[in-house]
Amino acid sequence: MENLKKMAGIKAAEFVSDGMVVGLGTGSTAYYFVEEIGRRIKEEGLQITAVTTSSVTSKQAEGLNIPLKSIDQVDFVDVTVDGADEVDSQFNGIKGGGGALLMEKIVATPSKEYIWVVDESKLVDKLGAFKLPVEVVQYGAEQIFRRFERAGYKPSFREKDGQRFVTDMQNFIIDLALDVIEDPIVFGQELDHVVGVVEHGLFNQMVDKVIVAGRDGVQILTSRKEK
């Protein structure tokens, strides 16, 4: 599995060229993309500027001497490469297993090209088997939790080291065990209107390409948005 992730990450780095502003994703597959960008800077003299989607990725990039700017210091991002936890046939996805969904979506939005790198196990007919993360402000988080409970969404607060997990933006994450999301667009809109929800892990019709590594090699899926 790790080898598949590495294959996808290295393939994605081929979409990066000199002079670009590059969004560096977060997670186990995006990790290999960041490593490959670091290698190309060191060995090939690749010249780029990068923005990151989490403190974890910032630390990795700094260790590789990748030049960084904050998202507010750039007008746009040429290409962002990130992982995904699930991708359906309509190019909707669930992200945020690593807890960086808000920053990931902020960087994805001004990106001219948005690419996901996944292994083939992440491709699904319908989203929902992977728990859907919802980032909420700390104030009133229990109210939101109970609302989700009443709706039958089987919520749970994400924890780390026995404490509630706190995101880089100092928010909590409530994971929803939905099993199946029949209409990700409609459900995303519902979550958008819940007061106290900062962001959710549904990335609907945002991605341009999905690089999939499988036993038969690497394939690139292109969304209708890109065609």
Curated annotation (Swiss-Prot):
InterPro entries assigned: NagB/RpiA_transferase-like (IPR037171), Ribose-5P_isomerase (IPR050262), Ribose5P_isomerase_typA_subgr (IPR020672), Ribose5P_isomerase_type_A (IPR004788)
CDD domains registered for this protein in UniProt: RPI_A
SUPFAM superfamilies per UniProt: D-ribose-5-phosphate isomerase (RpiA), lid domain, NagB/RpiA/CoA transferase-like
Enzyme Commission number(s) of this protein: 5.3.1.6
Organism domain of life: Bacteria
Enzyme class: isomerase
Active site: 104
Keyword Protease annotated: no
Keywords: Isomerase
GO-annotated biological processes: pentose-phosphate shunt, non-oxidative branch
Residues noted as binding substrate in the record, renumbered to the chain: 26-29, 82-85, 95-98, 122
Catalytic activity: aldehydo-D-ribose 5-phosphate = D-ribulose 5-phosphate
Pathway: Carbohydrate degradation; pentose phosphate pathway; D-ribose 5-phosphate from D-ribulose 5-phosphate (non-oxidative stage): step 1/1
NCBIfam families in alphabetical order: PRK00702.1, rpiA
Function: Catalyzes the reversible conversion of ribose-5-phosphate to ribulose 5-phosphate.
Self-association state and partner proteins as the record states: Homodimer.
Name of the protein: Ribose-5-phosphate isomerase A
